[in-house]
């Protein structure tokens, strides 16, 4: 009898913990973690469909746009990185060789498109 009442008490405690967690999850506002346009590419479309955090289903279905606070990054904050300059790269490598005598450089062979070639 004691075992049965302990088992029932354990089940009730587990169910109430799940219920509390579910109620708290409903109170978290749904936010878009990644703001991408689905038409940009198929990969972006997958992310746009998938990355929604409401914590009832974590990675759940996309909610209506009326529910979501969409954050747009202004163009002024986006900084484009210039391509690497060979002189700057050579200076960096020489500096590293000076600081670390055992520094070694590894050069991967590439094709004209700039892709790394593993097998030639």
Swiss-Prot record:
Residues 46-59 are annotated as: PID14 protease inhibitor domain. It is found in: Secreted. The keyword Metal-binding does not apply. The keyword Secreted applies. Keywords: Secreted, Signal. Changing residue 51 to A: Impairs the virulence. GO terms for cellular component: extracellular region. Residues 1-25 form the signal peptide. Disruption phenotype: Keeps the ability to penetrate maize epidermis and to grow intracellularly at sites of infection but fails to spread and induce tumors in infected leaves. Cleaved by host target papain-like cysteine proteases (PLCPs) to release the embedded inhibitor peptide PID14. Induction: Expression is highly up-regulated during all stages of pathogenic development. Expression is positively regulated by the unfolded protein response (UPR) signaling via the binding of CIB1 to the UPRE motif localized at the PIT1/PIT2 promoter. Secreted effector required for virulence. Functions as an inhibitor of a set of apoplastic maize papain-like cysteine proteases (PLCPs) including CP1A, CP1B, XCP2 and CP2, whose activity is directly linked with salicylic-acid-associated plant defenses. Acts as a substrate mimicking molecule for apoplastic PLCPs and its processing releases the embedded inhibitor peptide PID14, which in turn blocks PLCPs to modulate host immunity. The PID14 protease inhibitor domain is sufficient for inhibition of host cysteine proteases. Interacts with host cysteine proteases CP1A, CP1B, XCP2 and CP2. This is Secreted effector PIT2.
